[in-house]
Amino acid sequence: MMKWKRIVSAAVCVCMAGMLITGCGSKSDSSSKKRIIRVALSQSEEHPEYKGMETFKKYVEEKLGDKYEVQLYPNELLGGQTKAIELTQTGAIDFTIAGTPNLEIFADVYEVFSMPYLFTSEDAYFAAMNDTDYMNKIYASTEDTGLQVVTWYNVGTRNFYAKKAINTPDDLKGLKMRVQQSPASIKMCNAFGAAASPMAFGEVYTAIQQGVIDGAE
């Protein structure tokens, strides 16, 4: 198992940038005798996240195709990120890629990643995230819950998009803003004077079009 986990981590780090979560594993396909590796994603087939996992799939099946088959489920086909993490816990799927805010309900140490203005520079950010000893302690926080974080990726600068320009926190006052389903993100948004509206990524654009929310993080 540890050898397999090392293979997965190396492959994903080369192919993409991602907070990859693995669980207890699922069953083999008895008819083919192959081990089915199921991966849930929230992004579409055109997103770099999916493209990275396609490369991972190709790599695994080229090297170990007689033993493993990788099945990808994009577009939240199996549910939002929190649901996908729960499926990973139970072994219904093997991996998912999720934002750190979605891990807060499984280990509150992940709230640190939702804090605004935490780092003074991009260099400080990468220095912290590339500190293996520190990150391994973070990853270990979910071991007793049936899942293990394997690696991370950088999704860029946090930002808000809305029906009007957001230049300072004051511009958020009175707006209904979508945030991830994260206690820390909800507190942050409300502290800025907005009304936090937690929802899954797949619901965001429809909610904006229908006027349910004014914008999103």
Predicted regions and their residues:
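Contiguous mixed-secondary-structure segments that line small-molecule binding/active-site clefts
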Residues: 57-61, 89, 99-195
